[in-house]
Amino acid sequence: MSRMEGLMMDFPLTLTHLLRRAETFFGDSKIVTRLPDKSFHRTNHRETLRRARQLAVALRKAGLERGDRVATLCWNHYQHHEAYFGVPCGGFVLHTLNLRLHPNDLAYIASHAGDRAVIVDRALLPLLEQFRAETPIEHVWVVEDSYEELLTTADPDEWEDPELDEREAAAMCYTSGTTGRPRGVVYSHRSSVLHALGVGANNPLGMGVGIGDAVMPVVPMFHANAWGYPYLATMQGAKLVYPGPCLDADSLLEDMEQERVTWAAGVPTIWMGILARLDEEPGRWDLSAMKAMLVGGSAVPRAMIAAFEERHGLRICQGWGMTETSPVASTVALPNDLAQADADTRWDVQATAGLPLPFVEIRVRAGDQDVPWDGEAMGELEVRGPWVAASYYDTPESADRWTEDGWFRTGDIVSMDPRGFIQIKDRSKDVIKSGGEWISSVEVENALMAHPALAEAAVIAVPDEKWGERPLAAVVLRDGASATADELREFIAPQFAKWWLPDRIEFVAEIPKTSVGKFRKIALREQFTAEPAQTS
């Protein structure tokens, strides 16, 4: 029997559609940027996207060709938003450079990607000059300076839809892993549009962003497409609030209050700082418009989720993903029975990585076997879907990150409960293998973080002659607080088997972090495997 074909149009999924849609239907929706001097710049989607078309024309007039990489070295602001659309909608590839990386890494990344041009914030010019000579960059346009001159060379009405193939590259981002060279992930127009639809779907697993919302991406635009929020908000006509370089807690809280932010997204370290300020001055900021704060990048301590809700009436929604998954692949939402459950039960679920978004498929593997969904058995999380990378850019030596049947090996060790909620246990390189058993550093960290005296806690494996590895905790005390190692061990003891408890607890001034706010555990391992124990 012959199959019957559908009779629907073959309509390309490209970012040009989002641009035209926002200009046509949501032109008056606002885009607000906090400037370096703490003042505000206000514009709207219509004007910003007009300038994006102007940028697309100007890049072509400057001699750039289809597929050329245009880098940005910028904070979150409206000009960066213009590049998010003007570059890919002109047929070029947006390459966001992580301004927190070392110049040597930036030189490698810009060279490996083949960047021909860069748009850079004036304040970041000294950083650019440290590595530009080692790259193929030909053009430099400075925000608020030569960037504006570039735009004057073009008329936005000269822009013509380049009739892009939806599978053409739209953007690039390099991983910020703590081992090996950064690796390039190339997002297509299709994957970017589908990711925006998946993250923003008005269903229990999506964020449900609409025209009446105000979205604030605290997560940087220089990494993983700012979790897709610039595209999602533009697609839905939502107001956008960009914090610029002003990431101190007071500035962010002022932004949220003044602009009536309904959705905000950032890494746990950002929200820890905000929680501390809310605790110090409860009631100072009116955050009644806030629907939820999306947290990702590393596991969220259950204690933080409880503190925001109990003390301030604010909801934390955890998400999980990676640069390779565009980046959001799962989010937490509570089915009706769990939404009506007691607080402890709800917080247990909210502390998971949630359920996969539509079109993202997951499995948990130990060796060549699937791990049962019992909430106990652990294995490596593997994913596939339309916004999951199929390979790295020009890095054939990393092909082993994909299975023979096409799944991406995330490197995250997880368990799955019977309903499919993902519990991140550890990174495969960070799990502690003690006496043939696994200890989850993340679970011990989150338990320690519930202690009122601690601001941060990171747990690592250190070599042990008898057990192979044993856990060591590096902890940071809150200002004015005190605690002893024995007190901290006693605090978490009811939650774990005795052999899970850290043999050493080290008090440190700060925990080193990666460019995207994750703990740099490799630095801690180097420090504490070279030093004798100070506390035990």
Give each language-model segment a name.
Residues 345-350, 371, 386-411, 428-429, ...:
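Conserved ANL (AMP-binding/adenylate-forming) active-site segment centered on the GW(Y/F)…HTG consensus within
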Residues 235, 258-266, 276-348, 361, ...:
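Gly/Ser/Thr-rich phosphate-binding loop
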Residues 193-214, 222-262, 277-281:
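Conserved AMP-binding/adenylation subdomain of ANL enzymes
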Residues 41-46, 170-197:
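Conserved AMP-binding A3 loop
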Residues 31-77, 81-85, 102-107:
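Conserved AMP-binding/adenylate-forming core of the ANL superfamily
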